[in-house]
């Protein structure tokens, strides 16, 4: 007997799994019965967000499926006990830059948090009502303690005036509501405040349009006088260009930071003369793109050593660095993802994920690396788990691209003779993001049903150095799509997948790649777009401040290159778009507005292409509520069954596919929008 479901919020069910020498059920790929349902994938699995050391405890944020994905705060004591401090119903979550981060700060017995619903910044203290400290129309995040005058320093985004919101560093009084005092302003974006141990120096990061924080940023340093005023403000090494991030003072007051001066994000420090000294020379990345505030890729154990996470081509590890000798000791290299590295009272803590279901909060101490808290996760018996195969392939022009291949695995089934599995080509968003090989129930949902999955790290992904990351600049909607097409061809040539059952799916920027692949190429036979981009020109006019000039890098300056924007927009090139498409869209999306999906849906529907649109009320950019995630995943399965002619197992929602009768019939030309 095998326990096929573990930690899914319900008792595991015993199911007889055949031994290797027993007869397995022969069935079509895609129709296999899986022990992992969509409700198990999204209905009970929680996710850890940020860590922070407060006194002898570690505070961490965690989402709650039972509360519709809302986020609360828990406390991890040294003895391993867990206490809920802020209930998920409160719903913490900053929306600075829309993506948020840096949602809470602990000081003594009090917590200071941003509430997701109203974006006010609250003080939560024992036996007291929550007190809002900030005015309406402002958003705060990434706060740090500043003992002078009982204040804290926060990143603020001010939305109270027309036009773009204003960025600043402000001080907030901990005891009463008020406007707060501006410490630093005058820049398009500000992040990452850090203060030294004796509260005499403050460091921070800024960047200006059209840069993103992974392009070119500036590191600043200022002195704090006895009155708490910021003086002697200077930029560190203004002559050197790079993406600098995560400044942090060592216990003895030396300023460290991460920069990609040598193509890779490595550690640097400011020496006694004020010169920059490179501390690590890894051909790997310490840290990642700052989509959110409050990221921590390293922490100091003491004055002599630090612990840092690193990423190499999608795999993650942990190292200890001797600050005097420069000697590096690799503590772990078997992780798929590591984030939120913080110094606690009894060791360094971090959030880690592995290729196996084991994930959670880990501690590094004299006893080694140990898992100290694991949230609920839907684990599977190994007989149902697909393991990633690291793939490097040659793409158009002879360049190399990367990805992870997951073959179909189900201990109860075998495929029909002489068949190959359908492929789901999965594209991450960003496009400055990356796929890794962390155990993901959403991937196992597909592989345990008989699908092959390929997670593509197309040119532009992180984890491969600055040059690879910027190879997409000027080529977005082209190079990423070419990589997907060439990856599919590689997998077909290897005999791993069925050439007639190739599907491509992605969200946001990945959704653009999906639509472009179907509009400009004929490799894929179906596509699924989650809040994808169909009109790049309109996106640049409608999106929020943080990404409003991102397209200057990805495409080129507008309106000078207006023609290229239209050339790359799938909405205007539907003549060759003939394959079925499913569109899923949050109707409150502020990053990629619903019109991006609605317009291409109407054009394809009018053309006669089999097309479905699911607009979801109450959801923004990325679905948060478990029941909506479940609906999307199950609808996607139904869609593939209709397109690839198999019957999925289980009770699934009905899907209205317009022009379903035309699945095998030539389509007519679409009407272009006026």
Language model features: what each stretch is:
Residues 77-80, 125-128, 173-177, 224-227, ...:
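Short loop/turn segments that connect beta-strands within beta-propeller blades
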Residues 160, 210, 375-500, 507, ...:
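Cap/lid segment of the alpha/beta-hydrolase catalytic domain
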Residues 458-674:
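Active-site-proximal cap/loop segments of hydrolase catalytic domains
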Residues 43-57, 91-109, 137-152, 185-203, ...:
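Conserved beta-propeller blade repeats
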Residues 6-7:
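C-terminal motif of bacterial Sec signal peptides marking the signal peptidase cleavage site
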Residues 62-72, 92-98, 113-121, 135-140, ...:
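A flexible loop/linker signature enriched in serine peptidases of the S9 family
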Residues 36-42, 83-94, 129-134, 179-184, ...:
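A short beta-strand motif characteristic of beta-propeller blades
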Residues 47-50, 61-62, 71-73, 83-84, ...:
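Non-catalytic accessory segments flanking enzyme active sites
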């Amino acid at each position: 007997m095998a326990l096929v479901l573990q930690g899914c919020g319900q008792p595991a069910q015993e199911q007889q799994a055949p031994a290797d020498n027993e007869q397995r059920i022969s069935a079509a790929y895609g129709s296999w019965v899986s022990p992992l349902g969509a409700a198990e994938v999204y209905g009970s699995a929680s996710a850890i967000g940020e860590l922070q050391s407060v006194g002898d405890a570690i505070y961490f944020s965690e989402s709650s499926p039972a509360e519709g994905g809302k986020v609360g705060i828990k406390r991890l004591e040294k003895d391993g006990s867990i206490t809920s401090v802020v209930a998920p119903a409160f719903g913490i979550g900053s929306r600075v830059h829309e993506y948020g981060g840096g949602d809470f700060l602990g000081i003594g017995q009090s917590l200071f948090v941003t509430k997701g619903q109203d974006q006010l910044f609250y003080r939560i203290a024992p036996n007291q009502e929550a007190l809002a400290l900030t005015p309406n129309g402002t958003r705060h995040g990434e706060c740090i303690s500043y003992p002078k005058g009982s204040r804290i320093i926060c990143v603020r985004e001010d939305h109270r005036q027309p036009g773009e919101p204003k960025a600043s560093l402000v001080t907030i009084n901990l005891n009463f509501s008020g406007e707060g005092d501006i410490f630093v302003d005058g820049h398009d974006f500000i992040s990452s405040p850090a203060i030294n141990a004796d509260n005499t120096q403050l460091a921070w990061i800024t960047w200006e349009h059209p840069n993103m924080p992974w392009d070119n940023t500036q590191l600043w340093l200022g002195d704090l006088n006895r009155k708490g005023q910021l003086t002697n403000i200077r930029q560190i090494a203004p002559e050197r260009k790079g993406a600098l991030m995560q400044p942090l003072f060592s216990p003895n007051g030396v300023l460290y930071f991460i920069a990609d001066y040598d193509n890779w994000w490595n550690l640097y420090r400011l020496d006694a003369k004020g010169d920059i000294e490179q501390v690590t020379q890894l051909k790997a990345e310490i840290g990642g793109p700052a989509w959110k505030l409050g990221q921590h890729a390293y922490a100091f154990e003491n004055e002599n050593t630090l612990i840092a996470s690193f990423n190499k081509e999608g795999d993650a590890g942990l190292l200890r660095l001797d600050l005097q000798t420069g000697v590096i000791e690799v503590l772990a290299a078997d992780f798929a993802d590591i984030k939120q590295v913080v110094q606690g009272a009894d060791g360094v803590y971090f959030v880690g994920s592995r290729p196996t279901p084991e994930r959670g909060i880990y501690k590094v101490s004299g006893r080694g690396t140990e898992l100290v808290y694991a949230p609920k996760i839907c684990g599977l018996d190994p007989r149902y788990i697909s393991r990633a195969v690291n793939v490097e392939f040659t793409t158009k022009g002879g360049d190399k691209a990367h990805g992870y291949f997951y073959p179909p695995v189900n201990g109860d089934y075998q495929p029909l003779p002489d068949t190959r599995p359908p492929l789901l080509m999965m594209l991450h968003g960003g496009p400055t993001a990356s796929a890794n090989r962390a155990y993901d129930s959403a991937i196992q949902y597909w592989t345990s049903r008989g699908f092959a999955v390929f997670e593509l790290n197309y040119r532009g992904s992180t984890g491969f150095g600055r040059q690879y990351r910027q190879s997409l600049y000027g080529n977005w909607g082209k190079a990423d799509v070419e990589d997907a097409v060439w990856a599919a061809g590689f997998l077909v040539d290897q005999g791993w997948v069925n050439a007639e059952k190739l599907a491509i799916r992605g969200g946001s920027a990945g959704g653009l790649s999906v639509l472009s692949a179907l509009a400009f190429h004929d490799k894929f036979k179906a596509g699924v777009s989650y809040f994808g981009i169909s009109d790049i020109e309109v996106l640049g006019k409608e999106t929020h401040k943080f990404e409003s000039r991102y397209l200057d890098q990805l495409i080129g300056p507008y309106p000078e290159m207006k023609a290229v924007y239209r050339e790359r927009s799938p909405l205007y090139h539907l003549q060759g778009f003939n394959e079925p498409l499913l569109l899923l869209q949050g109707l409150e999306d502020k990053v990629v507005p619903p019109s991006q999906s609605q317009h291409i849906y109407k054009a394809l529907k009018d053309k006669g292409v089999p097309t479905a649109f699911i607009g979801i009320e109450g959801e923004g950019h990325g679905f948060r509520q478990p029941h909506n995630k479940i609906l999307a995943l199950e609808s996607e399965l139904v869609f593939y069954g209709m397109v690839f002619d198999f019957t999925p197992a289980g009770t699934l929602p009905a899907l209205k596919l317009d022009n379903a009768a035309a699945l095998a019939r030539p389509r007519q030309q679409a009407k272009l929008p006026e």
